[in-house]
Each structure stands twice: as structure tokens, then as C-alpha cells.
């Protein structure tokens, strides 16, 4: 057996820190690294030197884009725990990067949601929260920026309840707020905590609860104890008997309910002012799961049956790659989470999705932007491997004798595209290489060449997403490029069913060509995708030609019906046809299939679909009229309005085509005070006047 593990599994935490853009996530992560002794100099986002944000653009934009994985160690505020390992996966908070968030949530066991005490629960927080619900990730809440004007802890707690439908349980209360924010009350210990400003909060003092807060503390402490008692009959009986629970029992009850996703313990502080992050680290250990607290990961065994791998060094090795990054020093880094078994550098692993074997070269554990070379990595841990060639995001790597494919990640389809061309001949070749690497890192980004115009087209999740790609080409690969106007990814579909024959015959001396099919083409529900059914009876079309027919249909679908955009959400059934003993071939049936689809679809009430975005605008009341008027002009459908401390919230569905340049227009409408977020919602039929204009433009 291998050497024993340095830190037992139950003392490992894999967590993410998720937040809205300005909630202070990067500063919070920074402080975590500082107190756990990783970074000696605290990085500040607004000076652009944060340790986690290691890509240059993030420093310029002050937003976090790439999820870097960082390992640190914590012994507790009072050194009260044995050594724990905390792996932090940094998740971006910007809506164009939800894919990065999905990816990191997939490999986390628990998360800390950071909220701004002033802005509260913002639209973006809701998106990320829903994603975390989907993966059943237990969470803690940290209400940050308690020192800011307008800070209000309990208002944020209520928003977590109302807007996120969660069950927040404060385990701390703030002492003062805004510039009078002094420290926090620990409701479990019933003590006030004041961090020492002289040593940047590394030490603290405990004091009695201020007189004027005792009643409030009593009220919230009771709520917390009731929440803990509800975790088991045993604790409930103790609570009913004694009217109180010991600190150990409270923590035990809260832990159980947090792991079951029944409650969200809420803490508060100001990361920037070095208050509260230390206690947050204790809470990560007290309430968030270790790899042994979460269910075994499921997957598909080599024979197609369902299998699973539990977090143990003794099980066969299995891991999931969740992030590919190009590193200027070592080349391609593949970040992966080990679910079971042990991997040593030099081992060979198998990638079942690509059907390829790879050898693991160096293994690295990342500390934000420094790296430590390690000899082995074990169940429950997160590390990066250097130089894997075939592995892409979402792939499994496993032991070749015990093959398993862990659940695949689903990535959204891009909704926006731009044409891009190199500025000089010298950039031409480099551009291809750069785009290939970036597409390998980011599955929500696609590259293809437009056959007609021979232009290179890049597609992504939003304007910002593509801007950053172009930016990275310039910085990391020294490729200068000219970027065209953004274009919308329209789709086409049909509204009624038709039956259509496609017959291809060529008789020109020697062997001819013969293919004859009848297809039934029917519309499907929006989002249902494409389905092909073979309903041939009695072999009128031999089975070996059926895949060729489907191929012909699929190729024709890519070419569109009226406007040249891909066709979606249709079912095609081949139900009749004929063949010729000598002249029939796959080629002939492929052409027949494509002819039948082309002809049939054009008679089936074809319509153009456009991407509709879910947009949320937050605006001060005085600009409300202008903002709504502008959204109506953009064919927006207002879904609802709401109040928030930051102003009015307008929920609206708007076609993507009308949203280009919206950031600039909104700034000038509201003198820079309104903000918005936008994410893809659905495809919907474009109004006929719009559709006609687009078709005309295409022809």
C-alpha cells in the first residue's frame, strides 16, 4: 500500500466561494488565504493584485473569470482543531461565465455564498443559487461589507429567505453597522468577538454581550437552537427537557441540517476590514461536508450498468477533469477532482469518453498562483496534472482495469457569434492555434469556419465572453485580430407535419445511382431536439442504408430551410421507399434523404426562431420610465417589477438581437447608475416582419 495520507478524509473540505460581482468574493478569498498562512501580503482587488485572480484581464476588470483551485490549511481561530485541508475552487460571479460556475459546482462538496450587506441578494446570486440547488451543494452564507454605508444584516437574511427560498439561520449578529461596525456576536458561545486591528485580525478578544443587544441575541439564539434541535428526536428531547443545548450539540444539529440542505447558517463581517473571515473558516470546518459526508458519485461501468465510486483510497482510481488552463510556464494544466483511489505521477490512466490512454507526468497542487509539485493525490483531493493531451472539461480519467464514466457535464449552446480575422498574415497561423487552445479550455466557446465566406466564426455565451476570448488571444498568444459585428445564432423549425418523397436516380452508362425514400417530418416541443425514427417494414429500404438517410437529413438540417440557419426540434421518420439491387448505394440514399427533407420542410410552415434573453435591470426610481420605455422599444416583454435597496428591479424577456450595445445605452439613460444581468432563456418564434428582414439579409 502507498504511504498513509497526510490528512484524513474527514478533515478535508472542498468548497467554492460563490457571489455576485461586487459582493467582495475575491477579497474574502484573499483573507482566507492570508489567515491560513498562504499569502503573506494581502492582495486587494481594487489595486489589482489579488492572489486568486491570476489572469491579467481579471485584474483590470476587477471580476473573477477563471476558477483556480487553491489548497490551504486551517487549525481554527483558537487552534482548536487538528489540521484540516481546505481546497477552494474560485467561482466567477459574472453571468457570461455561468458555465465556469457549473463546472466548479460539479466538483465541490460545499459552498460559501458571499452577499453584500448593502446590495443583498442580487439577480446574479439567484442564478448561481439555482445552479447550486441542482447539484445539492450545502451552503453557508457570509454577509460581507458590514462596514459600508447602508449595511443591513437582517434585511439580507430576509432576502435569502424570500428571494432564494432558503432557510437562513444566523449563527452570529453584527455589533454595529456601517462605520460603527465593531465585531460580531457568536450566538453559540454567547460572546462578543472583537478582532485586533493592529495585527490585521489574526488575534481577537472575547467580551460580554453589550447590554443593549441582549434581548435581540436571546431571540436569534432561540431560533438557532430550535433549528439545531430539529435535526433529531434525541436533540429535540434534550432541548424540551433543559430549554437549551450545549455548544457541541448545537454545532452537531446545525451540521446535520446543513448537510441535508435544510438550513443555511449565516455569518457576517467585513473581509476588507479583516473582520469575520476567521470565524467563517471555523464554520467551514464545523458545518460543511467532507468528501465522506456526500453520497458516492455515480457513473456508468464499462458494460453499461450503473456503478459508483465512494471516497476511499482503497477503491479503484476515478477522477473528473473540471477545468483546463493554459499555463505560460508548464503548458496545459488539467484540474481534476479525485473521487476514489490513488494516483501517482508516472501512472497511466484511461479516458473512457475519448477511448484513450494517457500517462500522468507531473502532479501539482496549486496555491493560488504558486504551485507545489506532489508525488501522489488521493480520494477527495483536487490537483492539476501537466501535459494531458486528450482530456477536455467534463471527461473522466480512471484506472484502466476498472473503467467507469462519471456523469457527463452538460454545457449550454452558444447564443452569439462574431466573425474574426487576423490583422496580418503572420497572425493567421497563430490565431488557429490560439482559438483551438481556448476552445479546449472552455466548452461553451466554439470556433468554426463559415464555408461560404471562409471567415472564422467564434461563438459564445455573451458579448463579454467573446471580448475576453479576443483579449486573451492578444495577451497570451500575441495574436491581433479584427472582430466583426456580433451576430445572433438564429434557428429554424417547422409548425406542421408533412410527408415527402425524395428520389435520386442517375443513369449514365455503367453503374447508376438509385435511392428512394418517404419521410414524415413533424414538429417537436421547443427544446426537444432532433429525433430520427426508422419505421420501414419488410425491408423495402435495406437496413444498411438507413444511417445514410439520417446523415443526409442531418446535413440538410444544418443548411436551414429559408434563411440558412440550423433546423431544431423536429422528428423525422422514414416509413417507405424502394431500392435497386445494383444501383443503390449509401451515397444515393444520403442524397435522397437530404432532398426529401429540403423539399418537405419548406412545405411544413417553416419559422425562424430567435434567442430570447432573461434580463434583469436594477435602476434608481427616477430613471424607471426611460429604462422601461427603452426595453419596450427593444421588443422586451416586462415580466414583473420589484423593489430592492438598490432601486427598482425590472424583470424582462428581450430578444438577443435587440440587446447589442445595451450596456452603453443603459449607462447613458441612467447616468451610469443602473445595472443589468442577462442570461439565455429560450428560443422563440421571431415576428414575421423581423423574420422576413433576416431572410432577405441572408439571401
From Swiss-Prot:
Q: Which InterPro entries match?
A: EFG_II (IPR041095), EFG_III (IPR009022), EFG_III/V (IPR035647), EFG_IV (IPR047872), EFG_V (IPR035649), EFG_V-like (IPR000640), EFTu-like_2 (IPR004161), G_TR_CS (IPR031157)
Q: Which GO terms describe its biological process?
A: ribosome disassembly
One molecular function GO term is: guanosine tetraphosphate binding
Q: Does the keyword Transmembrane apply?
A: no
Q: Write out the entry's keywords from A to Z.
A: Cytoplasm, Elongation factor, GTP-binding, Nucleotide-binding, Protein biosynthesis
Q: Which SMART domains match?
A: EFG_C, EFG_IV
- Ligand binding (GTP): 19-26, 90-94, 144-147
Q: According to the UniProt entry, where is the signal peptide? A: none
Q: Where in the cell is it found?
A: Cytoplasm
Q: Where is this region: Disordered?
A: 292-312
Every tr-type G domain range: 10-292
Under PROSITE patterns, the record lists: G_TR_1, G_TR_2
Q: What cellular component terms from Gene Ontology apply here? A: cytosol
Q: Would you say which domain of life the source belongs to?
A: Bacteria
The family assignment reads: Belongs to the TRAFAC class translation factor GTPase superfamily. Classic translation factor GTPase family. EF-G/EF-2 subfamily.
- What does the protein in this record do? Catalyzes the GTP-dependent ribosomal translocation step during translation elongation. During this step, the ribosome changes from the pre-translocational (PRE) to the post-translocational (POST) state as the newly formed A-site-bound peptidyl-tRNA and P-site-bound deacylated tRNA move to the P and E sites, respectively. Catalyzes the coordinated movement of the two tRNA molecules, the mRNA and conformational changes in the ribosome.
Q: What is this protein called?
A: Elongation factor G
Gene for this chain: fusA
Amino acid at each position: 500500500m502507498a504511504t498513509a495520507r497526510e490528512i484524513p478524509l474527514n478533515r478535508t473540505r472542498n468548497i467554492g466561494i460563490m457571489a455576485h460581482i461586487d459582493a467582495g468574493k475575491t477579497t474574502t478569498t484573499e483573507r482566507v488565504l492570508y489567515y491560513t498562512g498562504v499569502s503573506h501580503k494581502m492582495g486587494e482587488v481594487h489595486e489589482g493584485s489579488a492572489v486568486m485572480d491570476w489572469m491579467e484581464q481579471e485584474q483590470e476588470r476587477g471580476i473573477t473569470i477563471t476558477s483556480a483551485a487553491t489548497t490551504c490549511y486551517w487549525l481554527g481561530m483558537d487552534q482548536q482543531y487538528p489540521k484540516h485541508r481546505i481546497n477552494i475552487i474560485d467561482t466567477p460571479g459574472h453571468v457570461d461565465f455561468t458555465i465556469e460556475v457549473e463546472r466548479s459546482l460539479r466538483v465541490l462538496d460545499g459552498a460559501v455564498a458571499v452577499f453584500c450587506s448593502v446590495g443583498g441578494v442580487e439577480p446574479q446570486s439567484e442564478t448561481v443559487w439555482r445552479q447550486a440547488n441542482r447539484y445539492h451543494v450545502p451552503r453557508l452564507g457570509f454577509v460581507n461589507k458590514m462596514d459600508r454605508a447602508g449595511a443591513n444584516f437582517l434585511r439580507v437574511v430576509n432576502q435569502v429567505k424570500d428571494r432564494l427560498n432558503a432557510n437562513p439561520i444566523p449563527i452570529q449578529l453584527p455589533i454595529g453597522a456601517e462605520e460603527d461596525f465593531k465585531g460580531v456576536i457568536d450566538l453559540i458561545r454567547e460572546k462578543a468577538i472583537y478582532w485586533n486591528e493592529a495585527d490585521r485580525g489574526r488575534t481577537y478578544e472575547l467580551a460580554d454581550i453589550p447590554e443593549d443587544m441582549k434581548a435581540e441575541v436571546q431571540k436569534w439564539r432561540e431560533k438557532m437552537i430550535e433549528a439545531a434541535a430539529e435535526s433529531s428526536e434525541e436533540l429535540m428531547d434534550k432541548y424540551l427537557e433543559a430549554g437549551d443545548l450545549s455548544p457541541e450539540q448545537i454545532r452537531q444539529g446545525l451540521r446535520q441540517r446543513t448537510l441535508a440542505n435544510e438550513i443555511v447558517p449565516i455569518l457576517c463581517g467585513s473581509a476588507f476590514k479583516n473582520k469575520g473571515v476567521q470565524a467563517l473558516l471555523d464554520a467551514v470546518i464545523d458545518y460543511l461536508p467532507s468528501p465522506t459526508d456526500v453520497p458516492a458519485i455515480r457513473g456508468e461501468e464499462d458494460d453499461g450498468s450503473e456503478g459508483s465510486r465512494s471516497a476511499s483510497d482503497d477503491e479503484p482510481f476515478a477522477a473528473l477533469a473540471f477545468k483546463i488552463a493554459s499555463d505560460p510556464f508548464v503548458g496545459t494544466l488539467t484540474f481534476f477532482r479525485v473521487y476514489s483511489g490513488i494516483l501517482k505521477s508516472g501512472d497511466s490512466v484511461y479516458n473512457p469518453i475519448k477511448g484513450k490512454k494517457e500517462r500522468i507526468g507531473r502532479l501539482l497542487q496549486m496555491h493560488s498562483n504558486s504551485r507545489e509539485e506532489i508525488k501522489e493525490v488521493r480520494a477527495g483531493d483536487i490537483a492539476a496534472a501537466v501535459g494531458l493531451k486528450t482530456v477536455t472539461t467534463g471527461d473522466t480519467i480512471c484506472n484502466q482495469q476498472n473503467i467507469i464514466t462519471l456523469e457527463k457535464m452538460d454545457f449550454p449552446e452558444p447564443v452569439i457569434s462574431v466573425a474574426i480575422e487576423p490583422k496580418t498574415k503572420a497572425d493567421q497561423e497563430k490565431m488557429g492555434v490560439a482559438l483551438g487552445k481556448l476552445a479546449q479550455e472552455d466548452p461553451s466557446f466554439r470556433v468554426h469556419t463559415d464555408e461560404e465566406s471562409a471567415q472564422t466564426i467564434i461563438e459564445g455565451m455573451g458579448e463579454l465572453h467573446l471580448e475576453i476570448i479576443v483579449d486573451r488571444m492578444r495577451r497570451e498568444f500575441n495574436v491581433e485580430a479584427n472582430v466583426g459585428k456580433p451576430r445572433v445564432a438564429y434557428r429554424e423549425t417547422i409548425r406542421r407535419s408533412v410527408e415527402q418523397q425524395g428520389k435520386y436516380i442517375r443513369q449514365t452508362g455503367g453503374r447508376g445511382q438509385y435511392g428512394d425514400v418517404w419521410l414524415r417530418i413533424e414538429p417537436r416541443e421547443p427544446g426537444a431536439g432532433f429525433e430520427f425514427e426508422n419505421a420501414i417494414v419488410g425491408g423495402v429500404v435495406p437496413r444498411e442504408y438507413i444511417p445514410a438517410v439520417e446523415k443526409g437529413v442531418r446535413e440538410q438540417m444544418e443548411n436551414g430551410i429559408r434563411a440558412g440557419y440550423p433546423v431544431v426540434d423536429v422528428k423525422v421518420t422514414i416509413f417507405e421507399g424502394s431500392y435497386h439491387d445494383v444501383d443503390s448505394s449509401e451515397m444515393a440514399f444520403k442524397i435522397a434523404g437530404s432532398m426529401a427533407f429540403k423539399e418537405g420542410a419548406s412545405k411544413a410552415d417553416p419559422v425562424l426562431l430567435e434567442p430570447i434573453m432573461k434580463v434583469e435591470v436594477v435602476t434608481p426610481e427616477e430613471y424607471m420610465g426611460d429604462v422601461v420605455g427603452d426595453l419596450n422599444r427593444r421588443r422586451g416583454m416586462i415580466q414583473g417589477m420589484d423593489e430592492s435597496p438598490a432601486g427598482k428591479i425590472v424583470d424582462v424577456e428581450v430578444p438577443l438581437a435587440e440587446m447589442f450595445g445595451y450596456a452603453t445605452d443603459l449607462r447613458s439613460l441612467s447616468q451610469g447608475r443602473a445595472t443589468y444581468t442577462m442570461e439565455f432563456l429560450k428560443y422563440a418564434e421571431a415576428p414575421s416582419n423581423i423574420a422576413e428582414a433576416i431572410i432577405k439579409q441572408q439571401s
